[in-house]
Amino acid sequence: MGAMRDKILSVLEDYDKANIHIGTIGSHSALNILKGAKDEGFSTVCICREREKKVYESFGVADKFVIVSDYSDLLDENIQEELRHLNTILIPHGSFNAYIGKFDSLLLPMFGNRELMIWETDRDRQREWLERSGVRMPKKYSRPEEIEGLAIVKYPGAKGGKGYFIVSSPEEFYEISDEMVKKGLIGEEDIKNAEIQEYILGANIYFSFFYSPVYGRVELIAVDRRYESTADALGKVPAKEQIRANINPTYTVIGNFPVVLRESLLVQAFEAAEGIVEVSKEIAYPGMVGAFCIESIFDENALMYVFEISARIVAGTNVGIPTSPYSYILFGENMYMGRRIAREIKLAAEKDMLGELIY
């Protein structure tokens, strides 16, 4: 993808660096991104459908709107030309993942590393990345027949946990899969592409880190946990009724809670983050840029298992607006992921380093 990056950098070269717009698709964490850009003095552009426009108008975070009928219109040359005319740097989030396979058609400077986003959405490549980083991981089952003990079944892409389920045997896998298909939570193709991991009992913790090429350091910006349907509702249903109703919990993410971790556990998170960043430089030049999230579980012995990584901003960072304990300690001012991204772009522009942040 080196030739593609050269094309992107050529577009960036023609930009008026004094009049950059920060842009993103109007969903996921756009409020975070656009507000952060405005806090750092940038003009902003929101690419959204007419229906979603009212959200970003009501919060006053978008200076300009580019209205599309579908987010895939972002790949349309006329839309891209309009954004290039505004000197737009795109900030990717989870809603961009649906278009990753078509990134070759997206000739716009994007903050971060689009090749790492491809690694993120490919389960096998993501696991290779994590294994090479030396992190502790749950066991992977290659096929349902290998399942022994509790296992969680997941699907490719950023589905927000939709349709994930837990099983304890091959028979249960096929039984619940059929049930999920009937409910419309997953499709037949999803079952074939499912990833089956050992289910570690423990506390799920999501670390939102930032790698700064300007400072050459890893920063912890926020920590969160997820509020999931229907898993987090089961505590309200008596055990007898759960059995009688044959309830199978699902893990669709509805929202997020902020978390402050025991300080002694942070070293495991930083070691994992540093290893992941180092390996990223080997697998996809120039390596990690900006926001990334390490999704983990701490077991009863407080050992950290990493089960997933996102090479971009995640929605859990929204709990850190206007600041989190970690970002405040580091910066001594209100700082959250959207603002941290914009701050990096501003610093890089001042130091003539923008090319190191863009792919």
From Swiss-Prot:
Pathway(s) the chain acts in: Purine metabolism; IMP biosynthesis via de novo pathway; 5-formamido-1-(5-phospho-D-ribosyl)imidazole-4-carboxamide from 5-amino-1-(5-phospho-D-ribosyl)imidazole-4-carboxamide (formate route): step 1/1
The UniProt record lists the keyword ATP-binding: yes
Domain ATP-grasp: 115-346
Alphabetical UniProt keywords: ATP-binding, Ligase, Magnesium, Manganese, Metal-binding, Nucleotide-binding, Purine biosynthesis
Residues at which 5-amino-1-(5-phospho-beta-D-ribosyl)imidazole-4-carboxamide binds: H28, S95, N256
EC number: 6.3.4.23
Gene3D superfamilies associated with the record: 3.40.50.20, ATP-grasp fold, A domain, ATP-grasp fold, B domain
The reaction(s) this protein catalyses: 5-amino-1-(5-phospho-beta-D-ribosyl)imidazole-4-carboxamide + formate + ATP = 5-formamido-1-(5-phospho-D-ribosyl)imidazole-4-carboxamide + ADP + phosphate
GO MF entries: ATP binding; ligase activity, forming carbon-nitrogen bonds; magnesium ion binding
Residue sites binding Mg(2+) per the record: E295, E308
Named cofactor requirement(s): Mg(2+); Mn(2+)
Physiological role: Catalyzes the ATP- and formate-dependent formylation of 5-aminoimidazole-4-carboxamide-1-beta-d-ribofuranosyl 5'-monophosphate (AICAR) to 5-formaminoimidazole-4-carboxamide-1-beta-d-ribofuranosyl 5'-monophosphate (FAICAR) in the absence of folates.
Family note: Belongs to the phosphohexose mutase family.
Protein name from the UniProt record: 5-formaminoimidazole-4-carboxamide-1-(beta)-D-ribofuranosyl 5'-monophosphate synthetase
Organism phylogeny: Archaea, Methanobacteriati, Methanobacteriota, Archaeoglobi, Archaeoglobales
